[in-house]
Amino acid sequence: MRLLLLNGPNINLLGQREPGLYGHQTLSDIELRLRDRASEAEVQLETFQSNFEGALVERVHQAMGSVDGILINAGAYTHTSIALRDALLGVAIPFVEVHLSNIHARESFRHHSHLADRALGVVCGFGAFSYDMAFDGLVNHLRGVEA
Protein backbone atom coordinates (compact mmCIF):
# COMPACT_ATOMS: atom_id res chain seq x y z
CA MET A 1 0.00 0.00 0.00
CA ARG A 2 1.24 3.48 -0.88
CA LEU A 3 0.01 6.71 0.66
CA LEU A 4 0.73 10.33 -0.15
CA LEU A 5 0.94 12.91 2.63
CA LEU A 6 0.16 16.25 1.00
CA ASN A 7 0.65 19.52 2.93
CA GLY A 8 -0.28 22.96 1.70
CA PRO A 9 0.71 26.55 2.39
CA ASN A 10 2.50 27.54 5.57
CA ILE A 11 2.65 23.98 6.91
CA ASN A 12 6.42 24.25 6.39
CA LEU A 13 6.40 26.85 9.20
CA LEU A 14 5.07 24.46 11.85
CA GLY A 15 6.95 24.83 15.11
CA GLN A 16 7.51 28.54 14.43
CA ARG A 17 4.12 29.81 13.28
CA GLU A 18 1.65 30.46 16.09
CA PRO A 19 2.84 27.59 18.32
CA GLY A 20 0.00 28.29 20.75
CA LEU A 21 -2.42 27.30 18.01
CA TYR A 22 -0.45 24.77 15.97
CA GLY A 23 2.00 23.35 18.53
CA HIS A 24 5.77 23.09 18.63
CA GLN A 25 6.27 20.08 16.36
CA THR A 26 7.73 20.77 12.95
CA LEU A 27 6.55 19.27 9.69
CA SER A 28 9.72 17.17 9.74
CA ASP A 29 8.76 15.84 13.19
CA ILE A 30 5.32 14.86 11.92
CA GLU A 31 6.69 13.27 8.76
CA LEU A 32 9.26 11.27 10.73
CA ARG A 33 6.63 9.95 13.13
CA LEU A 34 4.30 9.03 10.25
CA ARG A 35 7.15 7.30 8.39
CA ASP A 36 7.74 5.17 11.50
CA ARG A 37 4.02 4.32 11.71
CA ALA A 38 3.98 3.55 8.00
CA SER A 39 6.98 1.25 8.30
CA GLU A 40 5.34 -0.64 11.17
CA ALA A 41 2.14 -0.97 9.10
CA GLU A 42 4.07 -2.04 5.98
CA VAL A 43 2.89 1.06 4.13
CA GLN A 44 5.01 3.19 1.80
CA LEU A 45 4.59 6.88 2.58
CA GLU A 46 5.47 9.68 0.18
CA THR A 47 5.42 13.28 1.38
CA PHE A 48 5.00 16.58 -0.44
CA GLN A 49 4.56 20.15 0.76
CA SER A 50 4.07 23.28 -1.29
CA ASN A 51 2.88 26.82 -0.74
CA PHE A 52 1.66 26.93 -4.34
CA GLU A 53 -1.79 25.75 -5.37
CA GLY A 54 -0.69 24.65 -8.84
CA ALA A 55 2.11 22.49 -7.43
CA LEU A 56 -0.36 20.74 -5.12
CA VAL A 57 -2.78 20.14 -8.00
CA GLU A 58 0.07 18.80 -10.13
CA ARG A 59 1.19 16.43 -7.34
CA VAL A 60 -2.35 15.09 -7.00
CA HIS A 61 -2.40 14.42 -10.75
CA GLN A 62 0.95 12.60 -10.50
CA ALA A 63 -0.47 10.40 -7.73
CA MET A 64 -3.01 8.80 -10.07
CA GLY A 65 -2.15 5.15 -10.51
CA SER A 66 0.74 5.27 -8.04
CA VAL A 67 -0.86 5.74 -4.61
CA ASP A 68 -3.79 4.10 -2.88
CA GLY A 69 -4.77 7.00 -0.63
CA ILE A 70 -4.00 10.60 0.23
CA LEU A 71 -3.74 12.37 3.57
CA ILE A 72 -4.18 16.08 2.89
CA ASN A 73 -3.77 19.20 4.97
CA ALA A 74 -4.50 21.81 2.34
CA GLY A 75 -4.04 24.65 4.83
CA ALA A 76 -5.83 27.80 3.69
CA TYR A 77 -6.58 26.19 0.31
CA THR A 78 -9.10 24.03 2.17
CA HIS A 79 -11.40 27.04 2.22
CA THR A 80 -10.66 28.50 -1.20
CA SER A 81 -9.44 25.99 -3.77
CA ILE A 82 -11.94 24.58 -6.22
CA ALA A 83 -8.94 23.53 -8.34
CA LEU A 84 -7.59 21.27 -5.59
CA ARG A 85 -11.04 19.80 -5.02
CA ASP A 86 -11.43 19.11 -8.74
CA ALA A 87 -7.98 17.49 -8.88
CA LEU A 88 -8.82 15.15 -6.00
CA LEU A 89 -12.14 14.22 -7.59
CA GLY A 90 -10.50 13.80 -10.98
CA VAL A 91 -7.97 11.21 -9.82
CA ALA A 92 -10.56 9.36 -7.71
CA ILE A 93 -8.06 8.44 -4.98
CA PRO A 94 -9.60 8.07 -1.50
CA PHE A 95 -8.46 10.90 0.77
CA VAL A 96 -8.71 12.08 4.36
CA GLU A 97 -8.66 15.78 5.22
CA VAL A 98 -6.53 16.67 8.24
CA HIS A 99 -5.99 19.86 10.24
CA LEU A 100 -4.01 20.55 13.38
CA SER A 101 -6.52 23.05 14.76
CA ASN A 102 -10.27 22.70 15.01
CA ILE A 103 -11.28 24.72 11.96
CA HIS A 104 -14.87 24.89 13.24
CA ALA A 105 -13.79 26.67 16.42
CA ARG A 106 -11.92 29.39 14.53
CA GLU A 107 -12.86 32.32 12.30
CA SER A 108 -16.06 31.83 10.34
CA PHE A 109 -14.23 31.87 6.97
CA ARG A 110 -12.41 28.69 8.07
CA HIS A 111 -15.63 26.77 8.79
CA HIS A 112 -16.25 25.77 5.17
CA SER A 113 -14.10 23.15 3.47
CA HIS A 114 -14.23 22.56 -0.27
CA LEU A 115 -12.87 19.05 0.37
CA ALA A 116 -14.80 17.68 3.35
CA ASP A 117 -17.94 16.54 1.57
CA ARG A 118 -15.89 14.27 -0.71
CA ALA A 119 -13.32 13.10 1.85
CA LEU A 120 -13.54 9.70 3.54
CA GLY A 121 -13.23 11.64 6.77
CA VAL A 122 -11.98 14.81 8.38
CA VAL A 123 -9.73 14.87 11.44
CA CYS A 124 -9.08 18.22 13.10
CA GLY A 125 -8.31 19.78 16.44
CA PHE A 126 -5.85 17.27 17.90
CA GLY A 127 -2.66 19.06 16.95
CA ALA A 128 0.00 16.89 15.36
CA PHE A 129 -1.89 13.79 16.49
CA SER A 130 -4.56 14.64 13.92
CA TYR A 131 -2.15 13.22 11.34
CA ASP A 132 -1.81 9.93 13.26
CA MET A 133 -5.57 9.56 13.52
CA ALA A 134 -6.04 10.33 9.83
CA PHE A 135 -3.30 7.85 8.90
CA ASP A 136 -4.88 5.08 10.97
CA GLY A 137 -8.33 5.78 9.56
CA LEU A 138 -7.16 5.77 5.96
CA VAL A 139 -5.06 2.61 6.34
CA ASN A 140 -7.91 0.77 8.06
CA HIS A 141 -10.35 1.88 5.36
CA LEU A 142 -8.05 0.75 2.56
CA ARG A 143 -7.54 -2.60 4.29
CA GLY A 144 -11.27 -3.08 4.74
CA VAL A 145 -11.09 -3.03 8.53
CA GLU A 146 -14.47 -2.20 10.03
CA ALA A 147 -14.77 -0.12 13.19
UniProtKB/Swiss-Prot annotation:
Pfam families: DHquinase_II (PF01220). Keywords: Amino-acid biosynthesis, Aromatic amino acid biosynthesis, Lyase. GO terms for biological process: amino acid biosynthetic process; aromatic amino acid family biosynthetic process; chorismate biosynthetic process; quinate catabolic process. Pathway: Metabolic intermediate biosynthesis; chorismate biosynthesis; chorismate from D-erythrose 4-phosphate and phosphoenolpyruvate: step 3/7. The keyword Membrane does not apply. GO terms for molecular function: 3-dehydroquinate dehydratase activity. The record marks R17 as: Transition state stabilizer. The active site is at Y22, H99. Substrate binds at N73, H79, D86, L100, S101, R110. It catalyses: 3-dehydroquinate = 3-dehydroshikimate + H2O. InterPro entries: DHquinase_II (IPR001874), DHquinase_II_CS (IPR018509), DHquinase_II_sf (IPR036441). HAMAP family: AroQ (MF_00169). Catalyzes a trans-dehydration via an enolate intermediate. Homododecamer. Belongs to the type-II 3-dehydroquinase family. This is 3-dehydroquinate dehydratase.
